[in-house]
Design a protein with these regions (language model features):
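Hydrophobic hinge/microswitch elements
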Residues: 123-170, 176-177, 191
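Central regulatory/effector-binding core of bacterial HTH transcription factors
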Residues: 2-61, 215-219
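Acidic, Gly/Pro-rich loop/turn segments at junctions of secondary structure
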Residues: 34-110, 115-133
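Tryptophan-centric aromatic hotspots in well-structured domains and transmembrane helices
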Residues: 13-16, 60, 111-120, 134, ...
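Short, well-ordered beta-strand segments
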Residues: 5-7, 52, 76, 102, ...
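Alpha-helix/helix-capping structural signal
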Residues: 10-11, 79-80, 138, 156-157
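C-terminal effector-binding regulatory domain of bacterial HTH transcription factors
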Residues: 30, 155-168, 173-219
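Short, surface-exposed acidic/glycine-rich loop or hinge patches that mediate macromolecular interfaces
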Residues: 11, 108, 188-189
Length: 219
């Protein structure tokens, strides 16, 4: 049995890997898979990691890139909340006190909060700060699913809850960041057939239809 150890953030493991792992195991039944979910990044100098998924921009210390998933960042909320709020402008999102923003601690150094999102969209005015904060992005996403407010959504990361209707992408500008979810392997190691198979499987995914989100802003 071939062993494969994969490291990813808690949110990526929870929302992207776990819902889809059955398909990889069906494709590669001979691979014994171990998933390490952690938000504190550590290069694999002192432990055995075959592959990692990290959000940001290269270089990543001790690692090299073998694949990437592009992202769009857009406000998301529960469908019932989207229906109640109706059509919104960016100014509405910034100023209306009945639109509760949800924020979280960063699982990655370049992760955006609301202040960063507004800034990168070119918003120069003030905005209502988030009233609900979580130490985990997974908790922030679940709070949005439960109707507690509006969270920032990374569309590849949240592809499953967006597809199954637990979350709705709001009709607001989508941000196209330079950062990606990168598939990484240790610098001094050649990719094994299992690593190559996992990288292909992860990168293939479901392509994100760019027309699904309006007014994309590249930064």
């Amino acid at each position: 049995q071939v062993k494969l150890t994969v490291a990813a953030s808690v949110a990526f493991g929870h929302f992207r890997l776990l819902p889809l792992l059955a398909s990889f195991r069906d494709q590669e039944p001979g691979v014994d898979l171990r998933v390490i979910s952690e938000d504190s990044w550590a290069a694999p100098d002192d432990r055995q990691i075959d592959l990692a998924v990290r959000y940001g921009k290269p270089p990543f210390r001790g690692m090299r890139v073998v694949g990437a998933l592009e992202e769009r960042i857009i406000p998301v909320c529960a469908p019932q909340m989207a229906q109640r709020l109706g059509s919104l402008t960016l100014s509405d999102l910034a100023h209306r006190s009945d639109i509760q923003k949800i924020d979280s601690a960063s699982p990655e150094p370049s992760w955006l909060n609301w202040a960063g999102w507004f800034q990168q969209l070119g918003w120069r005015g003030s905005f209502e700060a988030a009233k609900l904060h979580f130490s985990s992005y997974s908790d922030a996403a679940y709070a949005a699913m439960n109707g507690e407010g509006v969270a920032l959504g990374w569309t590849h990361l949240l592809e499953r809850p967006l597809a199954d209707g637990r979350l709705t992408a709001m009709d607001l500008p989508a941000l196209s960041p330079k950062e990606r979810h990168y598939i990484l392997i240790p610098d001094r190691r050649q990719p094994t057939p299992a690593v190559e198979a996992f990288s292909r499987w992860l990168a293939s995914g479901s392509p994100e239809p760019t027309e699904r989100y309006r007014d994309q802003v590249e930064v």
